[in-house]
Amino acid sequence: MARYFILAAALLLTACSSTSKKPIADDPFYAPVYPEAPPTKIAATGSIYQDSQAASLYSDIRAHKVGDIITIVLKEATQAKKSAGNQIKKGSDLSLDPIYAGGSNVSIGGVPLDLRYKDSMNTKRESDADQSNSLDGSISANVMQVLNNGNLVVRGEKWISINNGDEFIRVTGIVRSQDIKPDNTIDSTRMANARIQYSGTGTFADAQKVGWLSQFFMSDWWPF
């Protein structure tokens, strides 16, 4: 019987534990795009200057086609605060003085009987939650797709190896070409459908994870 109990408890704890997919550095989803450039035919004019390889001093260096690189300046700050409270009061009062039965007062030893009942209940609950996060930095991403309206789908990642672990930043979203600054940068707050992930792997990242037993006590399966 004890073995079945241990097996059932193990299955329950396994179901309560959450498993997360471990990120990999070479995820194909974030792989850069290398556009295929058509071969250029250079006419033999005998001159050192070639018009096909010339660059204008007034050309726009902002990303506008698939494979171009754009720098995303991370300026994320979120703050959330929530408070809730409720109070329930209930009371009842009953009094019978004196008690009548059969058209006369009920008494014991000549002393009339009376009934008095009073009940009250007061329940008060309060809860507060406060959370704030900020992320500053920059990451260069690739233009993965140019939409019909001219918007650019950008995506990229950056991995940094530090001591016994790796830290990474991943970003994907949609930007307007009009929002790109002349230095080919754009603020992350100007991205639509943005997905920004900053995390890490290794010893230090594992030390911040909650154990399976603690997850059980914080889950809905814990009855108390």
Swiss-Prot record:
BP GO annotations: bacterial-type flagellum-dependent cell motility
Residues with a covalently attached lipid (S-diacylglycerol cysteine): 16
Predominant subcellular localization, coarse grouping: membrane
Keyword field contains Nucleus: no
Subcellular location field: Cell outer membrane; Bacterial flagellum basal body
GO cellular component: bacterial-type flagellum basal body, distal rod, L ring; cell outer membrane
Keyword set includes Transmembrane helix: no
Record GO terms (molecular function): cytoskeletal motor activity
Mode of membrane association: Lipid-anchor
Positions where lipid (N-palmitoyl cysteine) attaches: 16
Organism superkingdom: Bacteria
Signal peptide region: 1-15
Keywords assigned by UniProt, alphabetized: Bacterial flagellum, Cell outer membrane, Lipoprotein, Membrane, Palmitate, Signal
UniProt subunit comment: The basal body constitutes a major portion of the flagellar organelle and consists of four rings (L,P,S, and M) mounted on a central rod.
NCBIfam families in alphabetical order: PRK00249.1-4, PRK12698.1
Role according to the record: Assembles around the rod to form the L-ring and probably protects the motor/basal body from shearing forces during rotation.
Record-stated family: Belongs to the FlgH family.
Protein name per UniProt: Flagellar L-ring protein
Organism: Shewanella sp. (strain MR-4)
Gene label: flgH
